[in-house]
């Protein structure tokens, strides 16, 4: 187990306890204490609350968090997002899928040696719920027979599997494009 995997494993274990404690504080109306608990145990909250990317609170929070992470890494974000409020279940599932795609893009762009560090994000809900993320990349991206990227590294490729799982469970189509140093993934509900 690598050091990063060990750290992540510990973090996941501890997070269950942190969230249980936090849930109890909120249930008891201890909002100030919960806020201080978050700052202490989860880390400083980014100053992203003023950014409004879309009307859906879950999706907006996800976009704010991942775009702030990209900014910290010196990555420019080109985003055009036009999403209305989704149902609670749809919002959660769509948010996880988008987060996986954006996280993969951040990881890929962070590896670039030149100054082409940017990510393009598009999301709309009309005529159908659609999402795309694209980014420059270096190196070779391996794909399977269906054109889906695959990773030979242990512990990598789970984000792609999550995107495929979202598509399967939500009657959505996906398309991965890899050409001329540009990688993109598009997901659209049928």
Model-flagged regions — what are they?
Residues 116-127:
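Short beta-strand/loop element within the Bergerat-fold HATPase_c
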């Amino acid at each position: 187990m690598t050091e990063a995997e060990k750290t992540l494993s510990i973090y996941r274990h501890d997070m269950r306890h942190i969230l249980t404690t936090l849930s109890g504080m909120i249930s008891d109306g201890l909002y100030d204490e919960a806020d201080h608990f978050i700052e202490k145990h989860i880390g400083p909250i980014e100053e992203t609350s003023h950014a409004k990317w879309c009307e859906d609170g879950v999706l907006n929070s996800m976009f704010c968090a991942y775009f702030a992470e990209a900014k910290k890494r010196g990555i420019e974000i080109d985003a055009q997002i036009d999403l209305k409020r989704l149902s609670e279940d749809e919002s959660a599932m769509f948010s996880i899928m988008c987060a996986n795609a954006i996280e993969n893009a951040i990881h890929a762009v962070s590896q670039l040696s030149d100054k082409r560090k940017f990510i393009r994000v598009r999301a709309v809900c009309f005529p159908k719920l659609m999402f795309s993320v694209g980014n420059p990349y270096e190196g070779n991206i391996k794909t399977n027979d269906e054109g889906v990227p695959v990773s030979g590294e242990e512990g990598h490729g789970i984000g792609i599997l999550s995107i495929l799982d979202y598509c399967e469970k939500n009657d959505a189509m996906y398309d991965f494009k890899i050409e001329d140093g540009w990688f993109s993934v598009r997901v659209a509900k049928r």
